[in-house]
From Swiss-Prot:
Keywords: Cell membrane, Isomerase, Membrane, Transmembrane, Transmembrane helix. Not expressed in strain JS45 under standard conditions, but is functional when expressed in E.coli. This is Hydroxylaminobenzene mutase HabB. GO terms for cellular component: plasma membrane. Disruption phenotype: Mutants can still grow on nitrobenzene. One of its GO terms (molecular function) is (hydroxyamino)benzene mutase activity. Its EC number is 5.4.4.1. It is a multi-pass membrane protein.
Amino acid sequence: MTLHTPSTDAPLARRLLQLGIALFLLGLLTGFLLPMMANPRVGLSSHLEGVLNGMFLLALGLMWPQLSLGTGARKAAFGFAVYGTYANWLATLLAGFWGAGGRMMPIAAGGHTGTAAQEGLIAFALISLSLSMLVVCALALWGLRSAPARRNTDAPAAGPQPAA
């Protein structure tokens, strides 16, 4: 497992914060589009998904330096988090504009169904993002199992020092 330092964690943590606030903003803006949608009920879901998933990315960005994960697990968590959160917003946004989503979101869609291609795309997005978010949450929980591994060459070694 590669050790991570604050300087190596900072770019990904900052990127998660940027992507989180951007998705939060997209979620807010989606609320203004509801009257233009074929199914505003699913559009409301998109509005909420953007806002809530934006907050999830913000929370993940803030806790990022606390995660004890190797390089590969960190890259996977980052990629799955970004994909899962943005796909959730986009899939419900498209379903709202298309008047689709009845196959995967029967309650939210309120009986609206789209073409086979639209329903297939929405189904793929919702299933894949759900699996992605499960992986992200499992990795984050695993990463919080212990104190993060840090290498700090500026601080004195912990514990008793041998006599000189």
